[in-house]
């Protein structure tokens, strides 16, 4: 009977020792797993933070490019525009070019095709080093322009000329030299996108924009 009790206590002792060792190993393994998890989490957070920093830098770079783009190619909508000088004289009329909507370099949905530095580059003449001060591009079908020219003539500021007023606002790009005194090929223009009624002299395609229309 005593031997049985001794054996029983001995077995219990071994069991407790086994549980203690097992518990210790389990705690060590759990601590190791937690430590590894913390390390992975720390590395992930560090990587995520670095990615965010790089993304922020990329975003800042994009915003900078957009800012530079808008600074170099200003597109604005003035409340009123009064044209006051021509590139060859001071008759308060502007030379104009009518663009058909099928014009290959013009897409109504693409504002960059309306950017004046691009449009005016085709107007620069190698023998004339003076930049054209102002110019208007009319983005309408030729038939629409011809229809204006068939309307009754109205008074305009062009001496000895006959002008005709459009029945509706036209889609226009008004290009104005950003600073006076510029010479080709370094002509920098400000771009105005307009929808205005126009007065047009159909014999020489000079245009005046109607203020407030």
Swiss-Prot record:
GO terms for cellular component: extracellular region. It is found in: Secreted. Keywords: Cell adhesion, Fertilization, Glycoprotein, Secreted, Signal. Transmembrane segments: none annotated. Male-specific expression in proximal caput of the epididymis. Secreted proximal epididymal protein required for post-testicular sperm maturation and male fertility. May be involved in sperm adhesion to the egg zona pellucida. Does not have ribonuclease activity. This is Inactive ribonuclease-like protein 10. It comes from Sus scrofa (Pig).
